[in-house]
A protein has these predicted regions:
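Glycine-rich phosphate/ribose-binding loops and adjacent secondary-structure elements
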Residues: 77, 118-137
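Amphipathic alpha-helical segments at domain termini/boundaries
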Residues: 1-7, 17, 23-24, 31, ...
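Glycine/Thr-rich beta-alpha phosphate-binding loop at enzyme active sites
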Residues: 47-55, 117-126
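A structural preference for short, pocket-lining loop segments at secondary-structure junctions
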Residues: 4-53, 57-81, 103-108
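Sparse, context-dependent recognition of short Cys/His-centered cofactor- or disulfide-binding micro-motifs
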Residues: 2, 13-15, 85, 100, ...
């Protein structure tokens, strides 16, 4: 199977299963493990062949699947840990999340997780309000968008990603377990429906349409 197509179909199936059958599970944790270079190579193939019908349909499926995650009324946490592959298309999972935590390993740069942007993060997978997730994140401000675009292809460590505004927090290995535990326990202590409306407001903070108003809160 072709990885981008298989990944999109399996992710879509997982989202629909969780939304339909796990109604009491109010927080979802998003992780991506593997070879970031392979993800970027896949993105390069998508970009180079974007006018081919199969690639065009695959990009469309990825766009719809990620948009389905955006309008899921659950709290989304992305954990960028050692061995993570949040690069290019998979980095969109971190940008979908309400909070993204990235592990900082200042004493072991070789093992530190990296976040890598590609051209696919700039408009190929728009949200249901027609913004890219980076545009939404930076309120369409020119300076941070240009800074992010200038980092395309760079393997960003936690400090660099935090400086660019790409992650919520970057705890070091001493604080990581407690920071993540507290964040998840805080959310789990509330009703699954308690914050979903507020989080949907933040996900679509600039531009709303009927899809965001209805599906983002159901």
């Amino acid at each position: 199977a072709w990885w981008p197509l298989q990944m999109a179909r399996e992710l879509d199936d997982a989202i629909l299963h969780m939304r339909t059958n796990e109604l009491e599970m109010g927080a979802w944790v998003l992780k991506a493990a593997g070879d970031a270079a392979a993800v970027l190579a896949s993105d390069a193939v998508l970009l180079a062949n974007k006018d081919h019908w199969l690639v065009r349909e695959t990009i469309g499926l990825l766009r719809r699947t990620l948009a389905r995650l955006d309008v899921s009324s659950r709290s989304l946490f992305a954990l960028i840990e050692e061995g993570s592959a949040f690069a290019g298309t998979l980095a969109e999972l971190a940008f979908c999340a309400d909070r993204a935590y990235m592990l900082a390993l200042p004493d072991d740069a070789a093992k530190a997780p990296k976040l890598t942007l590609s051209e696919m993060n700039f408009g190929f997978f728009p949200m249901v309000n027609d913004q890219s997730r980076l545009q939404r994140r930076f309120y369409e401000e020119t300076a941070p968008m240009e800074a992010a675009r200038g980092a395309i292809g760079q393997a960003l460590d936690a400090d660099a990603a935090l400086a660019l505004g790409l992650v919520t927090a970057a705890p070091d290995d001493i604080d990581w377990a407690d920071e993540v535990r507290l964040a998840l326990e805080e959310r789990a202590s509330m009703s699954p429906d308690a914050l979903t409306g507020l989080e949907a407001n933040l996900r679509f903070s600039q531009k709303e349409n009927m899809a965001t108003r209805i599906f983002g809160r159901l």
